[in-house]
């Protein structure tokens, strides 16, 4: 089987694509799989790191506002449609699968025009713009939440699959757990809290953790904290203001991004983060308690909906973004 997977932007779009690719390879070792992305997103790091080839095209998210900048992006995205078509003619895929990001518009549309079967995965309970716009052109839409099915209009076929995840549950022995903690720079003496605002980082969460460090509230636990690559220098500057060196915070390991997330999530006792569909699914699969701070101002407030799925089974506590402080989080 020859497969193209379109995924771009954030880890929440890219990791489901990698999970699908890994499963295809597991079932059919001779499969040929390539990814299509942009030159700007996290796919440039995560896809090659997972062992897959990445082809890049021009693609941009467009706003409703009429502006010179938007017109330029529209022109580049039209170019991307042609670039995607060229890749498909050369690679000759049996199927094209989109797992999120504005890259899906050009790739799914190109595949449809060439008569190539298509699939699109929607992670959230409230379908995004890409799914709504591409519903007629997509042969099968896969959804993570059953509630999403009636919200997708004019689709040929909608199937409830759940979210494809890379992270699996492991029952580590004491020695293995201690090895992982030691590599992180922590130990087995205190509980471990994982803090991550997703691949883009979360400013409000980062500010709360800086407050905890500044006031030395972290006496009863250790922490591994992923700030997000774009916010690492901001956090470093905030800590510098309090004469705290980012690499010398007792009991807290601070990183831009965590690449061995499967190991870290398995050894962590509690997870703190946003409530994207991928994050919520991974936490549920691992059976870990969590504190979730849903991202506000997203379409249909879908992160709050995601978080409530875990809250309703007493697996998570929700703190609203506007109510978040270091003191409240520490409590």
Predicted regions and their residues:
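Donor-nucleotide binding loops and adjacent catalytic segments primarily
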Residues: 41, 46, 175-270, 304-307, ...
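Glycosyltransferases and closely related glycan-assembly transferases
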Residues: 83-96, 104-119, 132-140
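Conserved nucleotide-sugar phosphate-binding/catalytic loop shared by glycosyltransferases and other
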Residues: 3-8, 27-76, 81, 161, ...
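Short amphipathic alpha-helix
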Residues: 13-24
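Active-site-proximal region of nucleotide-activated glycan assembly enzymes
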Residues: 2, 42, 53, 112-178, ...
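Acidic donor-binding loop of glycosyltransferase active sites
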Residues: 93-95, 258, 262-281, 288
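Short alpha-helix at the nucleotide-sugar/activated-sugar donor binding site of glycosyltransferases
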Residues: 112, 135, 265, 283-284, ...
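Structural loop-to-beta junction motif characteristic of Rossmann-like glycosyltransferase folds
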Residues: 52, 116-117, 269-270, 287-295, ...
